[in-house]
Amino acid sequence: MQFQLFEAEQAFAGQVEEFIAQHWLDVAEPRRRLSAWLNAAGSESLRQQWYRSVVEVGWSVPHWPIEYGGCDWTRKQLHIWLSACLKYQTPAVLTFATAHVGPLLIEHGNAQQRALLQRMATFEESWCLGWADRRVATDSYGVNTRILRTPREISISGTKTRVIDGMTAAWMMCVTGGEGNEPNENRSSIVLLPLDQKGVKRDPKAALSTGRAMAEIVLNNALAASWATLDVPLDELRRRLTGLAANDLSALADSAALTEQVRQLKDRVAADPNMEFGLLRDCDALAIEASGLLGMEQRAITQGELPLPAVRLRAQTLWGKLSELQIAAFGYYAMPFVDSALADNEGAVDNTRPVGEMDMTMVMRRMLSPAIATELGVDLHDSLAQEVLGLPVQDE
């Protein structure tokens, strides 16, 4: 029986490789594919061509239930598909909409909200997360955005900052504070907000190193439908975003991406005669650790021997090591540019420096922090600590 299962998985892996070769590797030369993977300007048509192919074959949301467009795949098949996409650096098949918004709507949404799933599954509408507010500390969950409810609609006012993909998203999962002039305590809401409307103003901000643009979005009486409030506690949303959900297997494919990026880094280092030999040795060591991570992923998926957060924490550690190697090899140019990394509520290490002088030690620590690495501003360590210590949930 195990041998038959292995044969079936091998056959499926071959099918996936053939599909990616036909619809991605053979349709454009490497430089164009890299531009599309990095979301560079001028690569939209190539990305859309890939997405159309994925939708046509029915693999756009394989982790969703079948009745919403998902596939009747095993956990191993899902891992094979996601790993191959990461290995060959295709445009992301796990978007914020398909990885986070869709599953939440399937589990907690009403009929009107679930009607939004179809355009998510076809990649026709992208989504963003509006959580951080302007003038709120980088690592604070406080929300100043206000809402006003009427029987027909919801009006939202506030400013969302560090919104990834906010310049192009059609919808926002918007975290709001209290209603009207009421205090925020225990009043947080999650509202599904269409962004193509008069009350929304978007300003571009610095992009992440992956090429994903960020935005600051001003909401001035932006309107959402009366049914648009998602009945999910804010703490549950935080759990989902940090990867604590026990049934979320969609993100357990980091080993493939790590292995490929370590290989590319090693090739770049080996081609430069001025690089230190020690960097090559460190690349080899990290490649071995990435192979170990693959084993952890497979054990968590097929045997259930490892809790998913343990695998994600290990992946987070290895991504940090890769970042350190990239910075060691290429210095400043390997650092992700995130403006929020320049802000730190602990202040400078050396308080004798003039006010406003950049403390690069502090900046480096912020750049490599898990909160920056996750791109959504949430950290798995924080959520785990909250659970273990029994800290109260703070939704304000």
Model-derived features: where do they sit?
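Internal helix-loop-helix
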Residues: 48-123, 165-171, 290, 294-300, ...
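Glycine-rich phosphate/cofactor-binding loops in nucleotide/flavin-utilizing enzymes
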Residues: 2, 80, 330-396
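Amphipathic, small/basic residue-rich leader segments at the start of a protein or domain
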Residues: 1-95, 116, 338-347, 351, ...
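A short, Trp-centered hydrophobic/proline-enriched beta-strand micro-motif
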Residues: 123-132, 175
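Glycine-rich beta->alpha junctions and the first turn(s) of the following alpha-helix
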Residues: 2-5, 201-293, 370
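A short core secondary-structure module
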Residues: 153, 157-201
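A structural signal for short hydrophobic beta-strand segments in well-ordered beta-sheet cores
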Residues: 145-148
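C-terminal helix-coil-helix/basic helical segment that borders enzyme active sites and/or dimer interfaces
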Residues: 28-40, 274-280, 287-350
